[in-house]
């Protein structure tokens, strides 16, 4: 695994192992956080992971000219209303962003997406991806 930089509401961590990444992912401010995850000294590709309680939203940006892709999973449903919207937080623990529940996945699945990304540098196959 390459060294990974993780920006989040609490600051920035440089992680050399999956255990360090996992410890960083557990950091929240009132149960929420936003993580920007990329290999150290690079900007792309990166994952943006928004976390709220047991749920997450994952957005991958492969390069600077790509709008990115959003993770979703029909195989791992949540108990959220299918046609609803969930509030997550971006930039600060108080700035709200609305996310369609179709793109909200269990936090445990998001951690698998992150693990695959930090170990391989590739997008995970454990979810489907929709291009923006």
Language-model regions, residue ranges each:
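Acidic, proline/glycine-rich low-complexity IDRs
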Residues: 1-32, 61-132
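Short, well-structured hydrophobic secondary-structure segments
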Residues: 22-62
């Amino acid at each position: 695994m390459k060294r990974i930089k993780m920006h989040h509401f609490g600051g920035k961590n440089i992680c050399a192992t999956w255990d360090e990444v996992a410890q960083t992912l557990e950091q929240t401010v009132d149960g929420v956080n936003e993580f920007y995850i990329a290999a150290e000294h690079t900007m792309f590709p990166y994952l943006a992971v928004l976390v709220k309680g047991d749920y997450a939203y994952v957005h991958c940006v492969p390069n600077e000219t790509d709008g990115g892709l959003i993770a979703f999973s029909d195989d791992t449903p949540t108990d959220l209303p299918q046609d609803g919207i969930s509030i997550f937080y971006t930039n600060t623990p108080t700035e709200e962003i609305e996310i369609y529940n179709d793109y909200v996945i269990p936090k445990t699945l998001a951690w698998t997406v992150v693990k695959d990304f930090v170990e391989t540098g590739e997008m995970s196959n454990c979810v489907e991806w929709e291009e923006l």
